[in-house]
Design a protein with these regions (language model features):
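Catalytic cores of nucleic-acid ligases and guanylyltransferases
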Residues: 1-193
Length: 193
């Protein structure tokens, strides 16, 4: 009997490619949310982007929907290696320093030339192979994202759980700019964005 590979079950909901999707943007909070509904991620200092892989082409959009594929040529080239027929990846374009920090002014300077230092840090997957994933839990979307970018130059933004009583403000000399709590449930874009 020959070995038969089972095709993984499709996730999400069958849907046409949606085009640009309004971003779920961070907002200021007074108290750190905790519990099963929340995960936390490092907030990088860069350009928020949405990478579209469709019809054998890659496009990179700003958070306002402007096509910056030519400005982020390296990111587009890196995204070409994503293991998917079609996808929408949400992330941040950064220039990482040796200590892991990111600095927006360094990124702006890199974009003045032909930068080879910029990197996409991916943190969400909104669409995959003809299926809309936005109603799925964030943890499930991130698990699929990690699979499709494995072996590429794209970095994966790990998430972590933290309880509000144990967290404190970021130290002034912290390697990270900030961290961002995200709802572990379905994707919600902010109105008017």
């Amino acid at each position: 009997v020959a070995f038969q590979r089972r095709k993984p079950a499709a996730i999400g909901f069958k849907a046409p490619f949606p085009g640009f999707v309004g971003p779920a943007l961070a907002s200021s909070i007074v108290r750190v949310p905790s519990g099963a509904r929340w995960i936390h991620e490092i907030k990088f200092d860069g350009y928020r982007v949405q990478v579209h892989l469709a019809n054998e082409a890659v496009k990179v959009f700003t958070r306002r929907g402007h096509d910056w594929t030519n400005r982020f040529k390296k990111v587009a080239d890196d995204a070409w290696h994503i293991k998917a027929g079609s996808a929408i990846v949400d992330g941040e374009v950064v220039v990482p320093a040796a200590d892991g920090t990111t600095d927006f002014s360094v990124l702006q300077n890199e974009l003045k030339g032909k930068s080879t230092s910029i990197v996409l840090v991916a943190f969400d997957l909104l669409y995959l192979n003809g299926r809309d994933l936005r109603k799925l839990p964030l943890i499930q979307r991130k698990a699929e994202l990690k699979k499709i970018i494995a072996g590429t130059e794209i970095q994966f933004s790990e998430s972590f759980e933290i309880e509000a009583p144990t967290c404190s403000p970021m130290p002034a000399r912290s390697a990270w700019r900030a961290w961002s709590p995200r709802s572990a449930t379905a994707y919600t874009q902010r109105a008017g964005q």
